[in-house]
């Protein structure tokens, strides 16, 4: 395991935020019918992967990718709830709990 440095965690946080932004823009694009949002979504994804590439210089790939994906999913669920009124059923909440547990286990491994 590599030695932790805050700059890599900052890059990971930027990657997570950009992934969430990309997902929200993708929803706003309405299947790319609203092209500006589709283009903004693609730009945010490019930025997210660029930031993730910087994060993995100091964070193990398995940990960085799991945290990026996990936090991205959890925050996108929250954004869907707040912005679009989307709600999870009980199975969805069970999935979120398993997701968070998996992220914790990967970080502790």
From Swiss-Prot:
Transmembrane segments: 6-26, 36-56, 64-84, 88-108
Swiss-Prot/TrEMBL keywords: Cell inner membrane, Cell membrane, Membrane, Transmembrane, Transmembrane helix, Transport
Subunit structure and binding partners: Forms a complex with MdtJ.
Entry keyword annotation includes Repeat: no
Record Pfam families: Multi_Drug_Res (PF00893)
GO molecular function term, any single one: amino-acid betaine transmembrane transporter activity
Protein family according to the UniProt entry: Belongs to the drug/metabolite transporter (DMT) superfamily. Small multidrug resistance (SMR) (TC 2.A.7.1) family. MdtI subfamily.
GO BP annotation list: glycine betaine transport
Gene3D superfamilies assigned: 1.10.3730.20
Stored InterPro entries: Small_drug/metabolite_transptr (IPR000390), Small_multidrug_res (IPR045324), Spermidine_export_MdtI (IPR023737)
Organism annotation: Klebsiella pneumoniae subsp. pneumoniae (strain ATCC 700721 / MGH 78578)
GO CC aspect terms: plasma membrane
Keyword Ligase: no
UniProt-recorded name of the protein: Spermidine export protein MdtI
Location in or out of the cell: Cell inner membrane
First-listed, main subcellular location of the protein, grouped into a coarse class: membrane
Family annotation (SUPFAM superfamilies): Multidrug resistance efflux transporter EmrE
Its biological purpose: Catalyzes the excretion of spermidine.
Domain of life of the organism encoding this protein: Bacteria
Membrane topology: Multi-pass membrane protein
Gene: mdtI
């Amino acid at each position: 395991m590599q030695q932790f440095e805050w700059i890599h965690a900052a890059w990971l946080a930027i990657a997570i935020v950009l992934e969430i932004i990309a997902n929200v823009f993708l929803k706003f694009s309405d299947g790319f019918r609203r092209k500006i949002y589709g283009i903004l979504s693609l730009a945010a994804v490019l930025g997210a992967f660029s930031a993730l590439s910087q994060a993995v210089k100091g964070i193990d790939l398995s940990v960085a990718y799991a945290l990026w994906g996990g936090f991205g999913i959890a925050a996108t669920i929250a954004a869907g709830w707040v912005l679009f009124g989307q709600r999870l059923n009980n199975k969805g909440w069970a999935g979120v709990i398993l997701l968070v547990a998996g992220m914790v286990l990967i970080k502790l491994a």
